[in-house]
Regions:
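Hydrophobic faces of well-ordered beta-strands that scaffold small-molecule active sites
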Residues: 13-17, 36-42, 61-67, 110-112, ...
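Solvent-exposed loop/turn segments at secondary-structure junctions
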Residues: 19-22, 45-48, 69-73, 115-119, ...
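Catalytic domains of cell-wall/extracellular-matrix polysaccharide-remodeling enzymes
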Residues: 87-171, 192-209, 213
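Glycine-rich, charge-decorated loop segments at or immediately adjacent to ligand/cofactor-binding or catalytic sites
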Residues: 52-54, 75-76, 147-153, 224-225
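A short, acidic, amphipathic alpha-helical segment used as a generic capping/interface helix at domain edges
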Residues: 169-183
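A charged helix-plus-loop insertion that forms the helical arch/lid used to bind
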Residues: 77-89
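Active-site beta->alpha N-cap acidic-glycine motif
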Residues: 1-78
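Short, surface-exposed connector motifs at secondary-structure boundaries
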Residues: 9-11, 31-39, 106-109, 130-136, ...
Length: 225
């Protein structure tokens, strides 16, 4: 059988589900319904985070840890007490990042949670890049940091899947991930931990390979970027 992440020559599609670990029921739904090729991203604020990571890995999933970063509308939109701030000194950025990275073990990389203001901070992203490189941790960009730095392993999302929470909108976004894969050999989509998103992704994942694509974990895309 083909190992996860092994290229078979087909266009690669990868999906990340973010925001897991905060709601136990939704997190269990993800673990029970999604195939192992789907990458699961957990909030660092999750209770029982390590247990969730262990359960995800036991089911064959790759795991990412979310790093909350300052959005444009902060503090009205506040991703939590360890948010990486755009105007923070590099030492403070690294201190917060180290707290996040120390919350669990067994993840291959991190992904930004929000952060459209922080990623434009050269000093902030440089500090993040250095800390991740020292640990050998990948940086996956949710799509807003494509012009900024990251870790040594890197992939950038092509398509948010559930900006509009309706089955037709999510299905259309998944088709755009496929289109990106046809155009450049790989496509990466990101959905959040909503029951509807999980159902639509599970349904799509069950038949996407029959249409000529390879469903791959996010790290497989990061390695060839």
């Amino acid at each position: 059988p083909l190992r996860l992440g092994t290229c078979n020559g087909r266009p690669r599609v990868a999906i990340i589900i973010g925001g897991l670990g905060l709601n136990p029921d939704i997190t269990r739904q993800a673990l029970e319904t999604l195939p192992p090729q789907v990458t699961l991203a957990f909030s660092p604020y999750s209770p029982n985070l390590q247990d969730w990571i262990n359960r995800a890995r036991e089911r064959g999933h790759e795991v990412l840890l979310e790093v909350p970063m300052e959005p444009e509308d902060y503090p009205e939109n506040d991703p939590g007490p360890y948010t990486l701030r755009a105007r923070a000194q590099p030492a403070e950025t690294v201190r917060r990042l180290e707290w996040i990275l120390g919350r669990g073990a067994g993840y291959f990389g991190v992904i930004n949670r929000m952060g459209d203001r922080f990623v434009r901070s050269p000093g902030g992203m440089s500090a993040v890049q250095g800390a991740l490189r020292n640990r050998g941790v990948a940086f996956i960009d949710s799509g807003i940091a494509s012009a900024s730095g990251g870790g040594d392993l890197r992939a950038s999302a092509d398509q948010p899947l559930d900006t509009v929470l309706s089955p037709p909108a999510i299905d259309e976004a998944l088709l755009r991930v496929e289109a990106a894969a046809l155009q450049k050999g790989q496509g990466l989509g990101i959905a959040q931990a909503y029951p509807l998103s999980l159902r639509q992704v599970a349904s799509w994942a069950a038949q996407v390979e029959s249409r000529g694509y390879q469903l791959a974990p996010a790290s497989a895309l990061a390695r060839i970027r």
